[in-house]
Design a protein with these regions (language model features):
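A signal for long, low-complexity, Ser/Thr/Asn-enriched, surface-exposed stalk/shaft
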Residues: 2-7, 20-50
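Glycine- and small/polar-enriched repetitive beta-structure motifs of secreted/surface proteins
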Residues: 4-6, 10, 46-228
Length: 228
């Protein structure tokens, strides 16, 4: 800064290389940082208020949040855990993405290639190759290849493979069968059967035990409980 109040960047010799001699430290009340040159590698020690700074560990895990990924060890690799206790139980699972408060917190221990994004998404679930998006989506879903998108979608589906629940409370009441596709708000909310295809808001709402059904449209077979 010169006397006239102007600011300049650089040195009196613009071709001078960046060296330790012309770096500096800025004190700024909330922290102390190196000036950033080049790729910013000198910007260090920025805390995130959690168990880790924003650096991957030796196994390639990237973790941020109090208690997130707290049980990971030498065979827990290439995971991304962000949020309070996200992925807290994982001790051997790989290539998972858990984002949000308590996302996949309790029982995901060894599953691989899962995605849980949202408050308590997949909190008590397990398995591999599953996708949970939304608050409490797939809350207790276990198995493989499941998809739950929407608040409480597939919330209590405790097992079964290749289930798809899309919509607020879609297929939320549970069951253990697989190969069911439910799309629509409250569609199949109480459905516990297997190999069903339910499309439309409230379609198959009370289909508690029926299998091999196809219901299409708003309120389709809403009162049906056990037909197959």
């Amino acid at each position: 800064i010169i006397n006239a109040g102007n600011a300049g960047i650089g040195t009196t010799n613009p071709s001078a290389p960046v060296t330790a001699a012309n770096t500096g430290v800025i004190a700024a009340g909330v922290g102390t940082f190196h000036k950033v040159y080049g790729d910013g590698s000198e910007l260090i020690n920025i805390g995130l208020g959690g168990t880790d700074t924003w650096n991957q560990d030796a196994q390639g895990n990237l973790v941020a949040g109090v208690g997130a990924g707290v049980k990971r060890d030498a065979d827990t690799c290439s995971n991304l855990f962000i949020g309070c206790k996200a992925g807290a139980a994982v001790n051997s699972g790989d290539k998972n993405i858990f984002l949000g408060y308590y996302a996949a917190k309790d029982t995901f221990t060894s599953g691989n290639c899962n995605i849980a994004i949202g408050n308590e998404a997949g909190k008590c679930g397990n398995g591999s190759n599953q996708v949970f998006l939304g608050s409490s989506a797939g809350f207790c879903m276990s198995g493989n290849g499941g998809i739950a998108i929407g608040m409480n979608a597939g919330r209590h589906k405790t097992s079964g493979i290749a289930n798809v629940f899309i919509g607020c409370y879609a297929g939320s009441c549970g069951g253990t069968d697989g190969c069911t596709t439910i799309v629509g708000a409250l569609a199949g909310k109480c459905s516990e059967g297997g190999c069903n295809a339910l499309f439309g808001a409230r379609a198959g709402f009370n289909n508690t035990s029926g299998d091999f059904n196809t219901f299409l449209g708003f309120d389709a077979a809403c009162s049906s409980t056990s037909g197959s």
